[in-house]
């Protein structure tokens, strides 16, 4: 009886390990590599944030939420509704008068305090507007009156026709920018300024 039980347990263990190994191998072969992402470029603002967020280890991740009220996600980035210019300005610091220059947006925020980490990614309709629009985002964020602590740093970058604006605690911003740069070889930094 003990032999049968031992053989049964051993068989279950072997099948479990084989199944896990096969699943891991499938994930690696069907996943999108960083080279593919860089070669093809991002397809949406949300894709940029999801690609970066997947690079975070469990230790690097923080309590997060993303998206506008209609598209809110917990512990993940989300799409931001461009129809709500007030929320885009209030939550992400994007100047509401400039919303017409966008056709896509996504966000990732620290769930407990947005001054700790706030990131907005915006697809600009006309690439000629990118640098001027990035400067307006910077000015709009720096002109804010802060409550519940000051963010330490603001960084604005581009990935193709996308503007990535991120502000908050210096350590979290540095981690994010490193992972963004690792994900997309076309990242170009436009601004890196202290806030507090």
Model-derived features: where do they sit?
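Soluble, non-membrane globular domain cores that form compact, hydrophobic packing
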Residues: 21-118, 124-196
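Repetitive helical segments and hydrophobic/amphipathic motifs
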Residues: 11-12
């Amino acid at each position: 009886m003990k032999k049968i039980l031992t053989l049964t347990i051993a068989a279950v263990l072997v099948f479990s390990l084989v199944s896990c190994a096969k699943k891991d191998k499938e994930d690696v072969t069907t996943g999108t590599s960083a080279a593919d992402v860089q070669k093809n470029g991002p397809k949406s603002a949300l894709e940029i944030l999801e690609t970066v967020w997947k690079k975070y280890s469990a230790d690097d991740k923080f309590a997060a939420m993303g998206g506008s009220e209609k598209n809110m996600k917990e512990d993940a980035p989300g799409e931001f509704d461009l129809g709500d210019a007030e929320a885009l300005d209030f939550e992400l610091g994007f100047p509401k008068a400039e919303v017409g220059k966008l056709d896509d947006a996504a966000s990732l925020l620290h769930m407990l305090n947005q001054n700790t980490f706030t990131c907005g990614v915006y697809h600009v309709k006309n690439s000629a507007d990118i640098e001027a629009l990035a400067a307006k985002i910077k000015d709009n964020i720096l002109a804010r009156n802060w409550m519940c602590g000051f963010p330490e740093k603001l960084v604005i970058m581009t990935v193709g026709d996308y503007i990535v604006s991120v502000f908050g605690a210096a350590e979290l911003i540095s981690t994010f920018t490193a992972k963004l740069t690792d994900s997309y070889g076309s990242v170009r930094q436009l601004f890196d300024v202290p806030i507090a």
